[in-house]
Amino acid sequence: MQQQPLPGPGAPTTEPTKPPYSYIALIAMAIQSSPGQRATLSGIYRYIMGRFAFYRHNRPGWQNSIRHNLSLNECFVKVPRDDRKPGKGSYWTLDPDCHDMFEHGSFLRRRRRFTRQTGAEGTRGPAKARRGPLRATSQDPGVPNATTGRQCSFPPELPDPKGLSFGGLVGAMPASMCPATTDGRPRPPMEPKEISTPKPACPGELPVATSSSSCPAFGFPAGFSEAESFNKAPTPVLSPESGIGSSYQCRLQALNFCMGADPGLEHLLASAAPSPAPPTPPGSLRAPLPLPTDHKEPWVAGGFPVQGGSGYPLGLTPCLYRTPGMFFFE
């Protein structure tokens, strides 16, 4: 008769195997075996560990999986605990519509994932009903739209940089101060004429330079572009309220960049009688640097005394040259 070997410390020990049930099946078994078809979370843990030794000796990581399935699956319903009963934690029970989710009562096979139809309609229905009136009120044609009646608060189109020239400065003046504008059609050059009687300038009228003519007074060629000629500082336009005499306004015509020969300009500059009390001319009327000498006829008529704003006379340079139709200072 052979003796069987005694089990020693080196003999292999049998480890419990994992049961072939899903976590949903384990929770359903624990709930159905509990009194009242409801169990707390700790009661579900005790049932699983008491029936399956694998979960009793295994690490407690499976408990997190139990809580995860209780929260995500709609077949488990959380019922609050009654305040009159001792204990803590809510109860978990099965939804009445999911008792047949296992085929033939076997927890090994589950029919399909349970979806609570009534709860889904109850939760989604009010949301759609709330969205409906909001969409209807926003698209109601009877309600005036606040954005359509709002006027544009931005200023109109700004003038181009060309408007900063002398011509644009005159155009920016009010209608009461703006002189009569000329059309943009080119005009033939005016021939110099000798007229004995000057044409008096009204206080509200100011000379306007034509942009189409060249600038022979400064020796510019006829092809000199308008943009290059207007890059200089523009001559300030004086308002009629400034009290400037008519003779001084006519003298300002000689300082414009592009001008035709005024018939009465020569006679006005030849007169030695100054204006009674004109204001101080602006600083931009100072004499520029002398230009290269040309075949010109010097005309010395003495300085033009202009009464300054502080009461002292202000004289212009006496070096005034004359060409066959132009006058300018050097």
From Swiss-Prot:
Record GO terms (molecular function): DNA binding; DNA-binding transcription factor activity; DNA-binding transcription factor activity, RNA polymerase II-specific; DNA-binding transcription repressor activity, RNA polymerase II-specific; RNA polymerase II cis-regulatory region sequence-specific DNA binding
Biased amino acid composition, Basic and acidic residues: 184-196
Coiled coil: none
Cellular compartments per GO CC: chromatin; nucleus
Keyword Nucleus recorded: yes
UniProtKB keywords: DNA-binding, Nucleus, Repressor, Transcription, Transcription regulation
UniProt biased composition (Polar residues): 136-151
InterPro entries on file: FH_FOXS1, Fork_head_dom, FOX_domain-containing, TF_fork_head_CS_1, TF_fork_head_CS_2, WH-like_DNA-bd_sf, WH_DNA-bd_sf
PROSITE patterns: FORK_HEAD_1, FORK_HEAD_2, FORK_HEAD_3
Localization of this protein: Nucleus
UniProt-listed Pfam families: Forkhead (PF00250)
CDD domains: FH_FOXS1 (cd20037)
The UniProt record lists the keyword Repressor: yes
DNA-binding annotation, residue ranges on this chain: 17-108
Region span, Disordered: 111-157, 179-200
Superkingdom of origin: Eukaryota
Any one biological process term the GO annotation gives: anatomical structure morphogenesis
Job description of the protein: Transcriptional repressor that suppresses transcription from the FASLG, FOXO3 and FOXO4 promoters. May have a role in the organization of the testicular vasculature.
Protein name as it appears in the record: Forkhead box protein S1
Species the sequence originates in: Homo sapiens
Source organism phylogeny: Eukaryota, Metazoa, Chordata, Craniata, Vertebrata
Annotated gene: FOXS1
